[in-house]
């Protein structure tokens, strides 16, 4: 009986961890990252003040790490530091991403195309 309870708890924990895991997008202060949704965007939520951005067209959002002064060195954020969560709500789907900082501009996404596999339908 104890073994069954432990097994059930492990399964529930594993499922919960899988469901809460977001895709990751890496950004850098020298690169503007454009996120392209496969449908028109209704709303964008940036969960923190460490990321700035705007919706530049019906289906594209652009983001960058926020630095109070451009003269601040990259030491302001650490490699792989989680800056926040980005939620994009489209006409029928929602996508959520963990935004991480990378010190190397070559590892930052310049254009990130959202696939329907990365979204959830809310209708």
Regions found by a protein language model. Give the residues of each.
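Sec-dependent N-terminal signal peptides
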Residues: 4-14
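Glycine- and charge-rich intrinsically disordered segments
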Residues: 1
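A general "mature secreted/periplasmic domain" signal
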Residues: 19-123
């Amino acid at each position: 009986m104890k073994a069954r309870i432990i097994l059930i708890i492990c399964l529930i924990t594993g499922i919960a961890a899988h469901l809460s895991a977001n895709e990751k997008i890496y950004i850098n202060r020298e690169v503007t990252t454009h996120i392209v949704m496969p449908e028109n965007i209704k709303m964008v939520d940036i969960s923190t003040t460490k990321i700035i951005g705007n919706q530049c067209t019906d289906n594209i959002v652009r983001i960058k790490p926020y630095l109070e002064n451009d003269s601040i060195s990259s030491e302001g954020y650490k490699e792989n530091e989680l800056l926040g969560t980005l939620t994009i709500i489209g006409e029928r789907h929602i996508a959520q991403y963990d935004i991480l900082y990378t010190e190397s501009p070559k590892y930052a996404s310049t254009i990130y195309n959202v696939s329907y596999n990365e979204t959830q339908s809310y209708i």
